[in-house]
């Protein structure tokens, strides 16, 4: 049987040109990130007792560097005063309640006690302090030998480079007397030391 010859393909009937596709709708603008509400000190209800307020005022006055004792502190001192009063806000929280000032405003703008008190109340309500177990668990990650110690050098590096970075001087002050002869730190004793004041 002779091989079949390929049949010539019939040209398909020319279809009418397809209408141009409709232009794609413009992409929707990306959704704006959810804005965190701005802090309004006037909206904060003060729950402190008169004695507590007097104590806070006394501590606040110790930070007052105005020449005439105007009972004002710089924005840059706000976090220090909050921490002196037993609070533990992050730097980001302090900046947020201050209205996110520019770096150059931190030592120029002043804050009086009447403005500071609602900030203190807000921070004290929102504090989520870690427990002893939280801190020990966090340090256990660095316990390579599972022997209850971490290398002092590694802890120094972490404290100075991660999260809310500490200065070298702050790290040295914090770790003073905590290292053994091998440069290791017993982290359970270290956490007890920190939490005791």
UniProtKB/Swiss-Prot annotation:
Annotated organism of origin: Sus scrofa (Pig)
Residues annotated with N,N-dimethylproline modification: 2
Signal peptide (from-to): none
GO cellular-component term (any): myosin II complex
Basic and acidic residues biased stretches: 1-13, 33-43
Protein name per Swiss-Prot or TrEMBL: Myosin light chain 4
Gene3D superfamilies, A to Z: EF-hand
MF terms in GO: actin filament binding; actin monomer binding; calcium ion binding
Self-association and partners: Myosin is a hexamer of 2 heavy chains and 4 light chains.
Pro residues bias spans: 18-32
PROSITE patterns in alphabetical order: EF_HAND_2
UniProt entry keywords in alphabetical sequence: Methylation, Motor protein, Muscle protein, Myosin
Residue ranges constituting the EF-hand domain according to the UniProt record: 56-93, 135-170
Superkingdom, taxonomy of origin: Eukaryota
Residue numbers spanned by region Disordered: 1-43
Its job: Regulatory light chain of myosin. Does not bind calcium.
Entry's Gene Ontology BP terms: cardiac muscle contraction; regulation of the force of heart contraction
């Amino acid at each position: 049987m002779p091989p079949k010859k390929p049949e010539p393909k019939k040209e398909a009937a020319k279809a009418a040109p397809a209408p141009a596709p409709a232009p794609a709708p413009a992409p929707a603008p990306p959704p704006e990130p959810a804005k965190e509400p701005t802090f309004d000190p006037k909206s904060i209800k003060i729950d402190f007792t008169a004695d507590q307020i007097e104590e806070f005022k006394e501590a606040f006055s110790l930070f007052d560097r105005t020449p005439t004792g105007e009972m004002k502190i710089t924005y840059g001192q706000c976090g220090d005063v909050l921490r002196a009063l037993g609070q533990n806000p992050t730097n980001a929280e302090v900046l947020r309640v201050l209205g996110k000032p520019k770096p150059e405003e931190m030592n120029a703008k002043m804050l009086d006690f009447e403005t500071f008190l609602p900030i203190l109340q807000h921070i004290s309500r929102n504090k989520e302090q870690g427990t002893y177990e939280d801190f020990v668990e966090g340090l256990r990650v660095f316990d390579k030998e599972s022997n209850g110690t971490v290398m002092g050098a590694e802890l120094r590096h972490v404290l100075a480079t991660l999260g809310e970075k500490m200065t070298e001087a702050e790290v040295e002050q914090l770790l003073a007397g905590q290292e053994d002869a091998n440069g290791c730190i017993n982290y359970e004793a270290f956490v007890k030391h920190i939490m005791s004041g």
